[in-house]
């Protein structure tokens, strides 16, 4: 399920960048 990993890795809010 790369979609799930992509959603997490592509989440700026999750990374705390925004």
Swiss-Prot record:
Coiled coil segments of this chain: none
GO biological process: chemical synaptic transmission; neuropeptide signaling pathway
Gene Ontology CC terms, in alphabetical order: extracellular region; synapse
Tissue expression summary: Eyestalk sinus gland.
Protein localization: Secreted
Keyword Protein transport: no
Residues with Valine amide modification: 18
GO molecular function (one): hormone activity
Function: Causes the migration of the distal retinal pigment into the proximal end of the pigment chromatophore cells and thus decreases the amount of light entering the retinulas. May also function as a neurotransmitter and/or neuromodulator.
Family statement drawn from the similarity comment of this UniProt entry: Belongs to the arthropod PDH family.
UniProt protein name: Pigment-dispersing hormone C
Organism: Faxonius limosus (Spinycheek crayfish)
């Amino acid at each position: 399920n790369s979609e799930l990993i992509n959603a997490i890795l592509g989440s700026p809010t999750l990374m705390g960048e925004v």
